[in-house]
C-alpha cells in the first residue's frame, strides 16, 4: 500500500477506530476510510504522503477549504477525513467528525489568523459578494491578459453534469459558465468531466466534423509576411494546435477579429444538444397523460421533454398551447376546454387539481346512480312530461327566479358578470361558430394540432412575432411528423381507406384521419345538421344516438345493447356529415348511454380498422474479410433420404423458401436428413459448419430464457407457436449464394438439383440473432398498442397474458395472430393453447400457479458419463422449484478426464442421493406468480452436506427455489460461502424481477460485520437487511492483527526433496525450543502445513507463529471452518482451542531472527539451491535504477516472488500497478515523436513503436529547427522509414519536412483533438515522467536526469515479447531483419531450379519438384503441397529454362555448367 500503510501507526490506529462518523452514531472509522482518502487525493493533484504528518494534512485542508461550500459529497467526506487525521497527528482527543472539525478550526485560527471560519459541510454556504460574471480574458493597461477559470467555476460545471446527467439544463448551463471563455478554458471544462465518456466521444466527433468544415470553408492563404499572425485552422479553434496568446490575439485584434471562443462554444453546444437528445429519448409528441395520472405530474413530464426539444420559441409556444391540452386524458381535457381560449398554466393546474381524486369519483358515481334509478319513461307520454324548473338567482331546483326569496344577484344570472343581462349573455350561445380564422381544414386527430374538431384547440389569436405563413408551415411539419409517428406504431382507425397501399409502402404524404386507441375514438358528427358527439364502434352493427329529433317518418324498433333492450326510432336515408364527408345511412334514436356509429355508417364512410406495422426488411450479412464461401462436396445418401429431401425441397420451393441455384454458383454445403420425433416424418439438415466459420460474428440479443416466476398474475393466458419461424424471415439477397446445396441422385442417374435459401436456414449461426431482432421489430407496435397485455416472446414461443375479459382477450390474441399471419408467419392450430394447463418452455402454466412439466428420471442398468451428465442436468432443472435436490455425490462420479462413453461405477453415497432425489420429485411442487406491490423476500438455509438452499417468496407464496453447492476452494469458510449465495440470489433476482429481495440469513450481525471488516473487498454484494433467523454460520477462532506480548513465538518451516519426496518439518521458538519431524512421500506445501500444525499442538492457549509460506498464510487468513484435507481439519481443531492467535508471514529467511535458524534446521539434506546471497545486490540495483520484476529475476536469478517483493517494498514504484508489457504490430522503421513539459522544461521524445526503445532530451525551444536537429540526430543512429507525430507547429514546419525528405523518412500526422492517434508516445511520456520522479534526487539538472531516466527505461526494464529490454529488442529486430534479407536474397537464387529425386529403394526418378533449400547433405523439395527432405546423393538439380528438358541431358545436371549456374 506504500504511503497509505504509514499514515497511522500503533496507538493512532486504535484511536481512529474509536471515532464515530456522526455524533451519536454507531458506525466508526476504519482503515478502509484512510485507503479511500489516499485514493481520492490523486484527483486533486495531492500526494498521498501528505497524510503522514500534521503539516501535510494542514496543506490538504488549505487546498480543499475553498472547494467545500460548492463541492460534492465525496469532497466533503474527504475534507472531514483529513480533519480527523490531523487531530490524530496533533494528539487531540475527538469523539466524532464534527468535534474534529471544530478543533481544526480553532487551531488554524490561532496559528495563521487567516482562517476566519471553517466551511460547514453540513449546509451550503452563501455565495460571495461581488461580480458573478466569468471573464477569463481581462484588459489591463490596454493589454489583454488571461485569467484561468476558478476552481469554483469548474466545480459548478462538473456538479451540473453529474446532477443533471446531460439533461436539457446542461446546454444553458454551459452557455452561462463558458461566457467569454477561450478554447483553452473550454477544453479545461471538458477535461473535468471524468465519467460520461460516451457523451465526450460524441462531442469529439462533432468537433472533428466542424473543424474539417472550417478548413474547407477557410482555405490556407498564401505565404504571410514575417511577424504577421496566421489565420486559425479548425484545430486552432479547437485549442489543440494553438496557444492561449494566439487565441486572445485572434479574438481581440483590431482588424477582422475572429471569435474563436464563441465559434468553439457553438461546436460544443451542437455536441451537447446531440447528447441531450441521446440521454432524453422521449419525444414531446409521445408525452401523454395516463388515465389516472395527476395533471400536475403530466405537466412536469411535458415541460421536461419540452426543454430537451431543440427548436425555435414559436414552435415551442405552439406545442405548449396545443399539445398540452391535446394529450391530456379525457377527464382533464373536458375541464380544460371549459376554460376558453389560451388559458394560463396556473388556471389549468387549478382547474384540474381534483381530477381523478375521490371527490370527482364520488360525483361521477352519484350521477351514474341518478341516471340508473330514474323512473322508466312511459310510452306515448312525452307530452305529459314537465321540465324541472330551476332558479337562475340561487341555482336551486323547484322554483323560478320570480319566486326566489334569496337576495337578488347583481349582474348576469348566467355568467355572473356585470354590464349585461342573461338574455344577452354571450356565453348562453351554443358556440357552434367561431369568430377567429379557421385556417386549413384538417382531420380530427386526438393527438394532432388541428384548428377544427371537437378535441382540439385552435391557433392562438394573439399576435405572434413570426408571420402567420411561417407558423402555419411549422404546424404542418409537426402534423406530418406526428402522422408518421402514429402510422408507424399505433393501432388505430383510419378513414377514409383511399390510397391504403401507398400508405403502407411508406408514403406518409396524405393526411388520412387516424384515431389512436389509447382512448375512445369520439368525433363530432352532424345528423341532419344537428351536432352530436358519437363513438366510432367497429363492434356495433347499427348506429344509435340520443338527444336529437328527426321528425315523425320513423319505424319503431327494439334493439339489444349493453344495458339491455332499448326502444328506438329507426330513420332511413338520413344525411350524416362526419370529417367533412357526407353520406346517407340508416340511424336510430333512443335512450342510449352513449351515441354510437356502427359498421353501417363506418363502411359507408370508408373507415377501416388497421394495424400499421413496419415492413420486414432483410438484414445485410457479409463474410469475414478475406474469406470465401464453403465449397464442400456432397456426401452419398441413401435412396430413402434422397426421396425425402426431394419432397421437402419441392415443398419449400413452392412456398418461396428455396430457389434453384444458377450453374455459375461455385459454392456448396452438404445436406442430409434425419427422422423427426414421431419417426414418421423427415427433417432436412444442412451442415453449415464451414459457412459458420467464414460468416461475420453476431450478438445474441436475448441473453436468457424468461422464467414463469417473473410473470405477473393475470386472469387469462394464451400460448401460441410460430411455425417454421426461420423460414418466415427473408435472407439478404447478396448472401443467399453462399447457402447453396445439392440434392444427389442414385447411381448418378442425372445431375443433382441445386438450391439456395431465400429465408433464414436452420443450422446457420446468424439465424437466431436475425430472428430475435426481426421479431422485436414486428411485435413492437403491438406492445405499444396494448400496454396492459403481457407479451413474452422467446424464439418461436409466444405467451400472452392479460386481465381483460374473455371476449377482449380472445380478440387481442386474434389481432396478434392476424398480424403475424399477414407478415408471413404461420401460427399452427395444433400448437395453439387456449385453455390451461399451458405447455410453455418446459413449464406448465395455470392462471394462478406454475409448475414443471412431468420429470422422468432415466432407469438404466449400465450408466455412462454421458448418462450421468444428462441426469445431473435434469436434477438441476428440477431444483428451481423442488427444494432439497442434491447432486454433489453424483458429480463426483464423473470427476477427472473421462470419455463420454466410459462406464461409471456407482458409490453408496451417490445411490443414496439419487434415491433421496426421487422421493423429493414424487411430491409435486407448485410456484406462484409475481405481485409487484408485495415485498420480495429470500430465505437461505444450509443442510448437513454443506449445500445451501434458498427460496424466493412473497409472504407464504413461493416464487422459486434454488441451491448453491459451488465450492471453489478446498478449504472453505461459511461466511464466504454465504456471501456467494447472497450474490447469486441478488443477480438472479435482478434478472427475473429487476429488484433485490429482502434476505433472511442464518448468521448473526456481529459475525458478519467481523468478517466483512477484513474481507470487504471481496466482490459485489447487494444491499440487504439482517433478519433474525437461527444462526448456523459462525467464525470458529479469533485471529488478532498484532503480536501478543509476553507469549512464546514459533518460527515454522518445511522443506521437501523433489526427487526422493523426503522432507522435514519443524519449528524453533524465541525461548530456545525446537523440534523437527522427518516426513516421507510429501510435498513442500504439506511440509509447511505439518510444521504449522506442530507449532499449534505444542503451544499454549495464546501464541505467536511466524511462517514463510504464503500457502499456509492464505489458508489461515481465510479462516476456514471445514476442509477436504485431514491435516487442515486438524489445524482448524487446534486453532479453535486457542484463546487468541497471531500469525504472520515473512518473505525468505535472511536477517530474520528465528526464521533463519529454523530454515537451516529443516534444510539439511533437503534443499539444494539457495539464492539468499543475491537479494542484497538486487535491492541495491533496484534502489539505483528502479528495475522491474522481470529484470531483477533475469539478472540475479531470483524467484519472481522475491523479485516482486523487492519492487513492492519500494515506495516510488507503488504509485501505479505493474505495467502489462506488450508490443504493437508495427514495422521496423516506424517511430513516433512528441514534445512534453516538466518543471518548465521542454522534453522531446521519440519512441520506436515495435520495441518501445526511447530517445529523449531537453531542447531549449519548441521550434521547427530544434525538432529538425533532433530528428537528424535520431536518423543518424537508427534506421527510420516512417515518423508519426501530431499536428504541432514544430512538427509541421519546413525544417522538419526538409530533414524528412533528405533522410527519406515518410511523415504522417494524427487527428486533431484525438491523442490516441499517437498513443505509443503519449503513453511513453507518462512512463518517462514516472521514471524521472523515481530518480529525481540523484541529479540536479533536468538535462541530466532525462538522460538517466532514458537509460533506465531502455536497459533496466525487461518484459514484453521475448522477455527482453527495449534496447535488446530493438537490436534483435534489426539483426533479424538483416538475416531475413540475406536469406531472402540467397533463397531467391534457388527459385529457377527444379529437382528430380529418388525415394527409398525405388529406382524410378520422381519430379520435378521446386527447390526450397540446398544444404551440404540434403535438399528440401516441394512437390505439390508436400515438402520432402531428400539426400543430395539421391537428387539431381537442374535449371528451369521454361521448356521441357530430358532428365538424362548432362548439360543440365548439377555441376556440369562451366559458368556456375547452379543452385
UniProtKB/Swiss-Prot annotation:
Positions with a binding annotation for Mg(2+) 2: 1053, 1088, 1108, 1159
CDD domains associated with the record: HIV_retropepsin_like
Renumbered residue ranges of the record's region Interaction with human PPIA/CYPA and NUP153: 191-228
Compositional bias ranges of the Basic and acidic residues kind: 467-483, 498-507
Catalytic activity annotation: Endopeptidase for which the P1 residue is preferably hydrophobic; Endohydrolysis of RNA in RNA/DNA hybrids. Three different cleavage modes: 1. sequence-specific internal cleavage of RNA. Human immunodeficiency virus type 1 and Moloney murine leukemia virus enzymes prefer to cleave the RNA strand one nucleotide away from the RNA-DNA junction. 2. RNA 5'-end directed cleavage 13-19 nucleotides from the RNA end. 3. DNA 3'-end directed cleavage 15-20 nucleotides away from the primer terminus; 3'-end directed exonucleolytic cleavage of viral RNA-DNA hybrid; DNA(n) + a 2'-deoxyribonucleoside 5'-triphosphate = DNA(n+1) + diphosphate
GO molecular function (one): RNA-directed DNA polymerase activity
Residues binding Mg(2+) 3, per UniProt: 1234, 1286, 1322
Cofactor(s) the record lists: Mg(2+)
Gene Ontology cellular-component annotations: host cell; host cell nucleus; host cell plasma membrane; host multivesicular body; membrane; viral nucleocapsid; virion membrane
Residue intervals of the Integrase catalytic domain: 1223-1374
Entry note: cofactor: Binds 2 magnesium ions for reverse transcriptase polymerase activity.
Motif segment (Tryptophan repeat motif): 1008-1024
Domain Reverse transcriptase: 655-845
SUPFAM superfamilies in alphabetical order: Acid proteases, DNA-binding domain of retroviral integrase, DNA/RNA polymerases, N-terminal Zn binding domain of HIV integrase, Retroviral matrix proteins, Retrovirus capsid dimerization domain-like, Retrovirus capsid protein, N-terminal core domain, Retrovirus zinc finger-like domains
Motif interval(s): Nuclear localization signal: 26-32
Annotated positions for site Essential for RT p66/p51 heterodimerization: 1011, 1024
Chain positions covered by the region annotation Dimerization of protease: 513-517, 561-567, 600-612
Gene3D superfamilies: 1.10.10.200, 1.10.1200.30, 3.30.70.270, Acid Proteases (2.40.70.10), HIV Type 1 Reverse Transcriptase, subunit A, domain 1 (3.10.10.10), Human Immunodeficiency Virus Type 1 Capsid Protein (1.10.375.10), Immunodeficiency lentiviruses, gag gene matrix protein p17 (1.10.150.90), Integrase, C-terminal domain superfamily, retroviral (2.30.30.10)
Location of the motif Nuclear export signal: 16-22
Pfam families: Gag_p17, Gag_p24, Gag_p24_C, IN_DBD_C, Integrase_Zn, RNase_H, rve, RVP
UniProt modified residues of type Phosphotyrosine: 135
Residues annotated for Zn(2+) binding in this entry: 1182, 1186, 1210, 1213
Region annotated RT 'primer grip', chain positions: 838-846
Name of the molecule in the record: Gag-Pol polyprotein
Biological source species: Human immunodeficiency virus type 2 subtype A (isolate KR)
Protein's gene: gag-pol
